């Protein structure tokens, strides 16, 4: 701050000593004072514009990155739903067949062909098999579910439109992962290597009223159908033609061999 003062002109050189004494004493300043304040140094405007521009650039860059990440997420979800899941569904569905020697129907071994559609659900740990009408006889068409979570097997005999439930036989039925690996290994060919057939016999024991207790997979298969429990016959016996009249056969495979399931005592 700069201070500038203006003193008034002296009226005369001569003066009384008393006047000098009084003049030497401090008196209210009658002088006119002007205060000058130095101008503040202003920052160059270009610095503000640069700082504002840099902040705006960061904001735009951040928004662009967010939009890019959202686009990548949506693209990943789209690819997963429409390509990966579709490919996974194709890999878990098999339409295959097997050639085997039939030693059960007659004493002469004849070559037979069995076809079936297989759906394997690895996450849910169950298998669903559809056996169409055999071309050369030998069994009924059926839908079969092997539920490894519940430890149950359900047969839906399409000809009779009835369901039969029994404990899962893990010595015959491969687990979903093992069965999937087997079918993937032979997927390049149409048929599995020629194999053989074994037989198991079931007996109807009781009617099932509470189908929900069988689990959701078997419930959806057997809902609205008469459902019965089965008991596996401990001793094998030769089924003659007369005894076979009261038995229904379902031929299927969930292993490297074919299984003929005889359901006897059919209501």
Swiss-Prot record:
Record-linked PROSITE patterns: BRICHOS
Glycosylation sites per record: 169
Protein's UniProt keywords contain Repeat: no
> Could you tell me what this protein is called?
Integral membrane protein 2C
Keyword list (alphabetical) reads: Cell membrane, Cleavage on pair of basic residues, Disulfide bond, Glycoprotein, Lysosome, Membrane, Phosphoprotein, Signal-anchor, Transmembrane, Transmembrane helix
Let me know which tissues express this protein, per UniProt. Answer: High levels in the brain, specifically in the cerebral cortex, medulla, amygdala, hippocampus, thalamus, caudate nucleus, cerebellum, olfactory lobe and spinal cord. Very low levels in other organs.
Question: Could you tell me which InterPro entries the record lists for this protein?
Answer: BRICHOS_dom (IPR007084), ITM2 (IPR040145)
* Taxonomic lineage of the native organism: Eukaryota, Metazoa, Chordata, Craniata, Vertebrata
GO terms classed as biological process: negative regulation of amyloid precursor protein biosynthetic process; negative regulation of neuron projection development; neuron differentiation; positive regulation of extrinsic apoptotic signaling pathway
Complexes and interactors: Interacts with BACE1. Interacts with APP. Interacts with STMN2.
Give the way it sits in the membrane: Single-pass type II membrane protein
User: Where, by residue number, does the polypeptide cross the bilayer?
Assistant: 55-75
The organism is Homo sapiens
The record's listing under Gene3D superfamilies reads: 3.30.390.150
* GO cellular component, as recorded: extracellular exosome; Golgi apparatus; lysosomal membrane; lysosome; perinuclear region of cytoplasm; plasma membrane
User: Which residue positions hold the site described Cleavage?
Assistant: 242-243
Its biological purpose = Negative regulator of amyloid-beta peptide production. May inhibit the processing of APP by blocking its access to alpha- and beta-secretase. Binding to the beta-secretase-cleaved APP C-terminal fragment is negligible, suggesting that ITM2C is a poor gamma-secretase cleavage inhibitor. May play a role in TNF-induced cell death and neuronal differentiation.
UniProt record similarity statement: Belongs to the ITM2 family.
Compartments where located: Lysosome membrane; Cell membrane
Q: Which Pfam families match?
A: BRICHOS (PF04089)
- Write one Gene Ontology MF term: amyloid-beta binding
Cysteines engaged in disulfide bonds, as pairs:
163-222
Q: How is it modified after translation?
A: Type I membrane-bound, as well as soluble, furin has a pre-eminent role in ITM2C proteolytic processing. PCSK7 and PCSK5 may also be involved although to a lesser extent. The soluble form of PCSK7 is incapable of processing ITM2C. Fails to undergo shedding by ADAM10 and intramembrane cleavage by SPPL2B.
Phosphothreonine occurs at 37
Under the heading PANTHER family, the entry gives: INTEGRAL MEMBRANE PROTEIN 2C (PTHR10962:SF5), INTEGRAL TRANSMEMBRANE PROTEIN 2 (PTHR10962)
